[in-house]
Amino acid sequence: MSHLVALAAALGPDATLISDSDITASYSRDHAPFAVSAPPFAVLVAKNAQEISKALIFANENKIPVVTRGAGSGLSGGANSDAQSLVISLEKMNQILDLDVANQIARVQAGVINIDLDTAAKEHGLAYLPDPASREWSTLGGNAA
């Protein structure tokens, strides 16, 4: 059984697993002009932590390299895959789960865009101050990475 078929079975029918190389190529690199990359064998567009957990267990058991991807806005090559890689995209995990105004704490998913958190914070007289040039489309998960 191929890794793709086995991974799809492990994730279940509701998972978004992409294997078309014309599409996976767009998930294969960040904006580093010098870093080597190749389209991964598959991209999981994760919707929740359970899908990520299942994918990581599968990858670990099968010695498959994993690249986690936010928006691909980085300039270091850190989000670049090779042909044996599984890319886990966090683009759909983009919810602001809680804004605790009193304690100035936000609980967010990794795919939240910088500007979206800043906009939500401004509604309460607060701000999300990291201001990368890519703030219009870079994610908090990428900031943390």
At which residue positions do the language-model features occur?
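N-terminal accessory segments
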Residues: 1-32, 61-64
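N-terminal glycine-rich flavin-associated loop
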Residues: 7, 34-66, 84, 90-133, ...
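Short glycine- and acidic-residue-rich catalytic loops of nucleotidyl-transferase/cyclase enzymes
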Residues: 69
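Conserved phosphate/anionic-ligand binding catalytic regions in large, soluble enzymes, centered on
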Residues: 79, 143-144
